[in-house]
Amino acid sequence: MAKIRDPRFKLSRRLGVNIYGHPKAMKRATRENSREGKKLSNYGKQLLEKQKIRSYYGVLEKQFLRYVKKAMKSKERTGDVLLRSLECRLDNIAYRIGFANSIRQARQMVNHGHILVNGSKVNIPSYEVKAGDVITLREKYRKNDEFADNFLSLKKFSLPYIEKDYDKFSGVLIKEPERDEIPIDANETLVVELYSK
């Protein structure tokens, strides 16, 4: 399976934004070695925003293009549909619920069969979670200190489209997320412009 192989901190510094949320990711960044302060062409800005979103969700170019094409077929605002589709990937929802401390770790958990959707094991990270779907950490993995700590430590962090049940180690996507509810700092409109040429 193909992977994004850029070192995470280096990639964050190159894009000029902490896409992985790690406190040390931007530590070595300066105005000289980050994008901040550099003048970009319109194409450069579009490309940068695409790289931000792709890297944040950990999807490859071919995968990303499929999401863009699907969004362009919708009658809704293309950028909103694009981000909503990426946000509703199973690996991302597992991360948002708090089973993992990164999307990368959540993807690994899905691949290894640690996550259930409506009681059934799903090992496809790109699986599209629908409103009403119940995402659960399999019972035998709830005793894993790392997974349990991840989940319980995020009690204060909540999103309006996810409802958590800490007793059952589960979360429900209660509705499709709106753009202003999705916690990602990116300009998806520039991405749509890039692919509309």
Swiss-Prot record:
GO molecular function: rRNA binding; structural constituent of ribosome
S4 RNA-binding domain residues: 88-151
Keyword annotations: Ribonucleoprotein, Ribosomal protein, RNA-binding, rRNA-binding
An individual GO BP term: translation
SUPFAM superfamilies per record: Alpha-L RNA-binding motif (SSF55174)
PROSITE patterns per the UniProt record, alphabetical: S4
Pfam families listed in its UniProt record: Ribosomal_S4 (PF00163), S4 (PF01479)
GO cellular component: small ribosomal subunit
Oligomer status and interactors: Part of the 30S ribosomal subunit. Contacts protein S5. The interaction surface between S4 and S5 is involved in control of translational fidelity.
Family the UniProt entry places it in: Belongs to the universal ribosomal protein uS4 family.
Function: One of the primary rRNA binding proteins, it binds directly to 16S rRNA where it nucleates assembly of the body of the 30S subunit.
Protein known as: Small ribosomal subunit protein uS4B
Source organism of the structure: Clostridium botulinum (strain Langeland / NCTC 10281 / Type F)
